[in-house]
Amino acid sequence: MSYILVTGGAGYIGSHTVVELVNNGYNVVVVDNLVNSSYDVIVRIEVLTRKQIPFFKIDLNDHDALDQVFKLYPIQAVLHFAALKAVGESTKFPLNYYSNNVGGAISLLKVMEENNVKNIVFSSSATVYGDATRFENMIPIPEHCPTGPTNPYGETKITIENIIRDVYANDKSWKCAILRYFNPIGAHPSGLIGEDPLGIPNNLLPFLAQVAIGRREKLSVFGSDYNSKDGTPIRDYIHVIDLAKGHIAALNYLFNHKDNGLCREWNLGTGNGSTVFEVFNAFCEAVGKKLPFEVVGRRDGDVLNLTANPKRANTELKWKAQLSINDACKDLWNWTTKNPFGFQINNYSWTKFDSESLTNYDRLNTVRTFNGKFEVSISNHGATIVAAKLNGIKLNLGFDNLKGYLREDNPFFGATIGRVANRISKGDLLINGTHYQVGLNELHRTSLHGGTYGYNKRTFLGPIVKTNEKEKETTMEFVLIDLDGTEGYPGDVETKVIYTVRDTGVGGELGIEYEAKLLEESGRDSTAVSLTNHSYWNIGNQPSIEGTHIKLVSNKHLESNPLDSTPTGKIVTSTDLDSQNSAKLGPDGPVFDYCFVTKQQDKLDTRNDELRVVATATHPKTRIAFTTLTTEPAFQFYTGDGVDVAGVFTKRSGFCLEASRYIYNPKWFIPLNKGEVYGSYTIYRFENF
């Protein structure tokens, strides 16, 4: 299996190209120093492509670190985007630009040569042409136009081009594509990735987008005295998706050029020039209102007209821009409204959860409420609630690192449970008249919580993190693709787990939304899904749950078979609750491990049902009230009497309140058919009283 290395793959153009690479069947490794980007871009690419992307935070000038990536992965080709790219900034800090851009490229080419990797697609720029209007008949600009950059940024690009040409001249086995592109705009139509400049944007549309959402007062138009139809500069604006596809076309061209090496330049543009005001008006139309602007002096290094002649790319690469400026403006506005602060979320942070891994697949993602009272940490491993804290008091049982969750005696602490929660007798799953044998993992008698390789053992993609300061909430969306046949379950299922951390004023709450569906490409038409969270709670800030007062909404629960704890099909009345459906938990009792029912199970998606309080727990020592609300028809209440984690936790260290469907029984079971959606919503609320 070979890989394409993408430098600067967390950047604007690089990230969109990574998506296109994956969509075209390539395996990708990304390196980026994250100076002008965020790792959250990689997270979103993974969710968008449903594929893990190996990532390394590396500066290209670090030869040894870069070389290690080439040693770990069989690199077939390199797409080189990594660079500082602001024209105006380059005039103020030229040495930084030469050191980073040129120095980084030299380091990369050395490592490539040492590892016998001789295919490169270089992200150059139309700025290498400088002011092409100084020549006759050079607008639109062809590749044979004489170069003459007017700023240090452009100089770094032409310098790197010349270095690549020298490398090829010395060794004709190299295959080098130099792509000179013009003004990329827009965003991915999903709204998941787009341009997110850290600090003040240097380009027209990112700045204008921030004006539209109120982050900037007005747009500054740099000069209205150019020799154009409205006095503003002319640029060839190209949708970033078209640009990304141009890189795929160039890469394929290199691979299809079998006989010998090559080094060639191609312009990537639309061939149509637009003025600043024309693009401004198109974006205002997408937004639906006129935006404020003022005309200021020209920007150092800017030229009148940079419009591409893309005929060479059209003919040789079989590539042509398909999307319009209006398309780009609509996609940019979609990205901006969904991500008003880009990837910058102040109350979210992450750390590696698996300290021994070279990748970042297993992370610990932490969100704090805006008042600072409530904090929740979720791992990608099992989309697990690792820690929940109210005013510094930990509310749940868990481990400090991934190793703890991999222990054999881990009783599913905090994990997302699926594909089917709780027990299936003999692993015999009946779906629409067909029997399926699912994995047995409990004394060879039952399938418990999805089997040996249930959702609790899986690494979820994500999270996509978004914040809403007005609603005082932040969401983390995790995604898992569970393939047909895993643990014997039929069908390819996409599962989303969306956690919402919300400020309640006197505390905080954690919402858990589940959504699952069979993928269209799945070869099965039906499957089984039943999801829950298996957190163990302890609100007493002490080793046991002793002294906790519990009040349940129902005293009716499913009767269990004493041999394997699976339901008999009957609903019975609990004898362990008082007349108020309450109980005080002591050191040894009462013992609960029942699936309490609150309503009839008759829906696959309960998210539109009433959100009802089903349980309340309080503790006099901490004066914490823990309320469980759910749309689900049942909940499992378990006092943790079987917990025995050697040297860490003992019985009754915590209790479970798992909002769920009825435990599997053909009598109540509702299958998930293709085209349908499984859904539920639960809230865990923690407040002081």
UniProtKB/Swiss-Prot annotation:
Cofactors demanded by this protein: NAD(+)
BP GO terms, sorted: galactose metabolic process
Enzyme class: isomerase
Coiled-coil features, chain-numbered ranges: none
Gene Ontology terms for molecular function: aldose 1-epimerase activity; carbohydrate binding; UDP-glucose 4-epimerase activity
Induction, per UniProt: By xylose.
Signal peptide interval: none
PROSITE patterns: ALDOSE_1_EPIMERASE
PANTHER family documented for this protein: UDP-GLUCOSE 4-EPIMERASE
Family: In the N-terminal section; belongs to the NAD(P)-dependent epimerase/dehydratase family.
NCBIfam families per the UniProt record, alphabetical: galE, PRK10675.1
Protein name (Swiss-Prot/TrEMBL): Bifunctional protein GAL10
Organism name: Pachysolen tannophilus (Yeast)
